[in-house]
Design a protein with these regions (language model features):
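Leloir-type glycosyltransferase catalytic cores
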Residues: 100-146, 319-388
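Structural motif
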Residues: 48-49, 196, 238, 287
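Active-site-proximal region of nucleotide-activated glycan assembly enzymes
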Residues: 75-174
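Active-site and donor-binding regions of nucleotide-sugar-utilizing enzymes
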Residues: 11-107
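N-terminal subdomain of nucleotide-sugar transferases
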Residues: 1-12
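Donor nucleotide-activated moiety binding/catalytic core segment of transferases
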Residues: 29-45, 245, 250-294, 301
């Protein structure tokens, strides 16, 4: 990369097969040996920077911790905070580990010196391309115990089991498209007389739930939210629960929601959706309840009152409700539009790269736009801090 030496560490056969640029070495032992292994690599190659995708996995944390001690710069890629045409690239950490401040005044002041961003250059990223990448990467997973005996996946289920459940759920999603679209039409049509709140589900296996919230899984989130809604929301309001589009279907959320609704005596006030058009729901809802999903950012784009139950980079006074969930249902506070505009521009300027991970054009854009960010002496966030 621009004359820089790159040394990659492979942890699985998928890593090995996917990398053809050279300079790779395989780590086959257990995670307990990683701190010493990384220290050896740092010393041998005089490492100045490390590059990760995500920063919560067991194979990543020892590298991040060592980098902090050694004064090595950490560049973390992640899905975009403002999708679909941006990816995240931050120094130090992403999401709840981000270095972005939580002070609204800082965003208002910093916004004066950054450009006004639109949605970025667009590109097409068909889902089948992403699925193909995933299948090709995991095709070799069954051989990992033989060639990488120390590796333990951060995902709690095997690729084969995951794909089988995806197939089953895809059939369910196809069957539910028309009924769910009709449910959305009815809910939206009646929203003036029967306001609704929206709870978009996240993936239980996501690091956002496991590391950046106090919830153990989405079942815990559902029970907490429905219990609070039943006890504290106005009787004429509805709670709409929408499943995550990439949920593999290990948990029957529809059955769970029905069971909890019966338990809390709100069966006629809860609507469960397996699929559906999220922007339509966001355009008419009275409020959004999320743990820390990027849907929270989309809710702010739609000027929706929003509460984040976990640790989210957008959770701050003026953007999200700062009180407890029990109070949220009756104390609706819309986000400050001007603050959100400033927040969005600053976040894009300091952490977002125009591009994508799952199609050739998007990848080429991301690489081209990421190189100057990674090779700069100071990050955009550091430059803003110096100006302040």
């Amino acid at each position: 990369m621009d004359g820089h030496a790159v040394h990659k560490v492979n942890f699985t056969i998928g890593d090995s097969v996917s990398w053809s640029a050279g300079g790779a070495r395989s780590y086959r032992r257990t995670a307990e040996g990683l701190p010493a292994h990384y220290a050896q690599l740092f010393d041998r190659y005089m490492v100045s920077d490390i590059v990760l995708f995500g920063d919560c996995r067991p194979i990543h944390r020892p590298a991040v911790d060592l980098a902090k001690v050694r004064g090595v710069r950490t560049h973390v890629f992640e899905e975009g905070y403002f999708r679909p045409y941006w990816v995240t690239l931050e120094r130090g950490g992403v999401n709840a580990y981000s270095s972005l401040p939580k002070d609204p005044r800082w965003y208002r002041e910093s916004a004066r010196s950054v450009p006004k961003y639109k949605n970025g250059d667009q590109f097409k990223s068909p889902f089948w391309v992403r699925a193909t990448h995933d299948v090709l990467y995991n095709f070799w997973a069954g051989l990992n115990p033989l060639f990488y005996p120390g590796y333990v996946s951060h995902v709690p289920y095997s690729p084969a089991s995951e794909y089988w459940h995806y197939v089953r759920r895809s059939i369910k999603v196809m069957r539910r498209q028309k009924p769910d679209a009709e449910s959305i039409r009815i809910v939206v049509e009646r929203a003036k007389d029967r306001p609704y709140y929206l709870l978009p589900l996240q993936l239980s296996s996501d690091a956002q739930i496991r590391f950046h919230s106090e919830f153990k899984d989405m079942e815990d989130v559902l029970e907490t939210t429905l219990r609070s809604f039943a006890s504290h929301a106005h009787q004429n309001t509805i709670l709409v629960i929408k499943n995550h589009p990439l949920d593999p279907g290990f948990t029957d959320y529809e059955a769970l929601v029905k069971s909890l609704a019966r338990e809390f005596a709100i069966e006629d006030r809860v609507v469960y959706l397996e699929t559906g058009h999220l922007p339509t729901l966001l355009s008419h809802t009275s409020g959004v309840v999320t743990v820390n999903s990027t849907v929270g950012g989309s809710a702010l784009v739609h000027d929706c009152p929003t509460i984040a139950l976990g640790r989210a980079m957008y959770d701050m006074p003026g953007l999200t409700f700062q009180g407890p969930l029990d109070d949220f249902w009756r104390k609706i506070e819309a986000p400050d539009k001007s603050l959100f505009r400033d927040f969005r521009n600053v976040v894009i300027h300091t952490t977002q790269v125009n591009g994508g991970f799952y199609c050739r054009h998007g990848i080429d854009m991301a690489v081209r736009n990421a190189i100057p960010v990674m090779t700069a002496l100071d990050s955009q966030l550091e430059r803003l801090a110096k100006r302040g």
